[in-house]
Amino acid sequence: MGLGKTLTTIALHLHRAETAGETAGPTLVVCPASLITNWQREIARFAPDTPVLRYHGTGRTLDTDALDHTTVVITTYGTLRRDPALTATQWGLVVADEAQHIKNPASATAKALRDVPARSRLAVTGTPVENNLTELWAILDWTNPGIFGTRSAFRARYGAVEKDPNAPAAAGLARLVAPFMLRRRKTDPGIAPELPGKVHHHRIVALTDEQTGLYEAIVRDTMDKITTSSGIERRGLVLKLLQALRQINNTPTLYLKEPLDDAEPDGLARRSGKLAALDELTSTLADRGEAALVFTGYVQMGRILEHHLRVRGRSVRFLHGGTPPARRQELVDAFQHDPDPAPVFILSVKAAGTGLTLTRAEHVIHYDRPWNPAVEDQATYRAHRIGQHRTVQVHHLITEGTVEDHINDLLARKRALTDSVLASGEGALTELDNTELTALVILRKSAC
């Protein structure tokens, strides 16, 4: 979010090293692979005398005898799960960056992190609650084991807050966690007074005839199956339906799994209302000399967009989960300093929705809108963060009358409600009854 969490953590490390001396012990930072280089650079910038060891990749070695109270070791969640050397070392401070990675206490990542011996623990995240309050409990229980009781007891006591943020339990929960949380928001006085605003634009685009035919056919065929199924089978069919509709809304090329080699640029745009709208928008930005981030939830959609925009002559890059960490930083640096006046950076939401600073962009385009408001906000914050000097324009491409149009209405009308209900994304929608589900996915035709 750009509120100085990394800098605050570095300051904490320096404070411990200075006040406790050798008894402080070394600091271990565990983060997503995409953030290793960012941590190295921030430490070099603000604490240049601090020894830093990057413990990741093949050939890594950990000389515990060389670690002292001034040392910071940076590793990834993936390395932590696989490497016993990290759990065999006594750490003074363990930092879990983007701590939402441990929101599931039963996951291998959360279990591995619990096994790391440390005198102190610090969780760093911009989204302590993405889906439900159990995630908040998981993070707090890692930092302070046992203080907040069992997960089931915590949920029983405060679960009502998820459905009603104004429930009586909300005030009690706030008082309970306040001593253990340092929370900053961009709207807090003095935090980011120089940060410009952001403006949201909802671009409602029509489906093409091909998209309409595919959409209506998949709704008709799948709803027939859903109405005669139950339990796990029904939930699976609902998720499959929602994924298919989102892909059709993006472009038939994605849904039909067509090879890009055979995709003619003008043909791609003619087949997809969204792609045609993106063409128009990026052309306008190119004329103005303004850079943009384009977020998508599908890696293959990112490849389609990259192929399409490159053929259109745009300066374009694509970062996704399969991009090696070193290459990720190269892409970020290249975008931030691209001599082209209007570069486009395509990013998968899952791989790039947190941690990166991309203030070169003054436009954020959500090609397929995340149904989790917290995830969407985190992606937008890649550009709207400290260091940004221009108003950020946030564009949501929404296909008219479709399931994402219905979801957009909910997000617009009931933001507080969606934080608790829709925050779990498609999973919550599997619990709708057949009538509610039909109303959600049915294609509403325009009156004109």
Predicted ranges, named:
Residues 167:
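Rossmann-like adenosine-cofactor binding region
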Residues 1-163, 175-195, 199-448:
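ASCE P-loop NTPase motor core, strongest for the SF2 helicase catalytic module
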